[in-house]
Swiss-Prot record:
Belongs to the tektin family. One of its GO terms (cellular component) is cytoplasm. Residues 54-96 form a coiled coil. Strongly expressed in brain, kidney and ovary. Moderately expressed in liver, spleen, thymus, prostate, testis, small intestine and colon. Weakly expressed in heart, placenta, lung and leukocytes. Interacts with MIS18A. Interacts (via its coiled-coil region) with MAFF. It is found in: Cytoplasm; Nucleus, Nucleolus. GO terms for biological process: cilium movement involved in cell motility. Keywords: Coiled coil, Cytoplasm, Nucleus, Transcription, Transcription regulation. It holds the Pfam family Tektin. This is MaFF-interacting protein. Acts as a coactivator of MAFF transcriptional activity. Inhibits cell growth and colony-forming efficiency.
Amino acid sequence: MLCPRAAFLVGSFHGVFPGPPASSHWEFWVPSTPVGAYFCPPQPQLTPPNTPKLVSEVEELYKSITALREKLLQAEQSLRNLKDIHMSLEKDVTAMTNSVFIDRQKCMAHRTCYPTILQLAGYQ
């Protein structure tokens, strides 16, 4: 079986070039194979030497992401609570503004007909 790098050599050198090509890509030649069939050395699995460190860093990142998502949910809940409080305070302010308006516009004219407490007490 040919490796992909040697496939082009089989077609061009088949029967003409009996030995392995002078290249550093092929380390050995198996003579029991047909002429022109060369084996490439097995490619090693490339794993970085600091893989455990990277794995631990990824786990730390996942933990950090989880913690940040929890904080985000808490912040969103706090924001919803603050919006509810804001709405209730706006309703209270509107009700008090309406009460003051009613007191000044409707009741004040009626109160001016009667003497004040100070006038009744004789201080004015």
